[in-house]
Design a protein with these regions (language model features):
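Conserved class I S-adenosyl-L-methionine
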Residues: 99-110
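Acidic active-site catalytic centers that drive phospho-/nucleotidyl reactions
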Residues: 21, 106, 128
Length: 169
């Protein structure tokens, strides 16, 4: 199911202007196992808050339903996706000087394809609520946190560390 905001997510202002309404839509990341299985659908509206300038979704859907066990993507199966992610990591390595033991994090790491593309000896962490089903594709030098990313979860796992680089696609 879903909930709807009545205040801006940043400023808490109630001044919200509807910019786009797509009507009822099915959750696109849900893949039913049979034609009889119900898939949640609901409104998709973008609202803008002139007070903060934030364009935001009016609705929030259940994360567990959107990103449950039937969700996930194996980037490693698609050669063009692997090349794209490797190029992305090469670009980031040129922009950010990474040293050995620097902490790099990929939020929504799927099958760890991005993390495997790093060329250095870094501490690599994948955070993904569906990661367990792809665990076999994680090499021994990649830590998987099979959960949704929150600052609190990160701090619980790395209380005295700061990530040098964080990615999410």
């Amino acid at each position: 199911m879903y909930s709807e905001i009545t205040k801006c997510r940043i400023s808490k202002s109630t001044n919200l202007v509807t910019v786009l309404s797509l009507g009822d839509q099915y959750l696109t990341g849900v893949f039913p196992k049979s034609v009889d299985e119900e898939v949640t659908k609901g409104p998709v509206d973008l609202v803008w808050c002139p007070d903060s300038g934030l364009l935001q979704m009016k609705q929030s859907y259940s994360l567990d339903e959107m990103y449950g066990d039937n969700y996930g993507y194996r980037s490693g199966l698609n050669a063009s996706m692997v090349r794209h992610l490797e190029q992305k990591i090469r670009t980031l390595e040129r922009l950010v000087k990474l040293n050995d033991n620097d902490l790099v994090i990929d939020i929504g790491s799927n099958d760890a394809t991005s993390l495997k593309a790093y060329s250095g000896n870094h501490r690599k962490v994948g955070i993904d609520p569906t990661g367990l089903k792809f665990k076999e594709f994680y090499t021994d030098n990649i830590t998987l946190i099979p959960d949704f990313f929150t600052a609190e979860k990160f701090e619980n796992n790395f209380p005295s560390d700061k990530a040098k680089l964080i990615t999410s696609i």
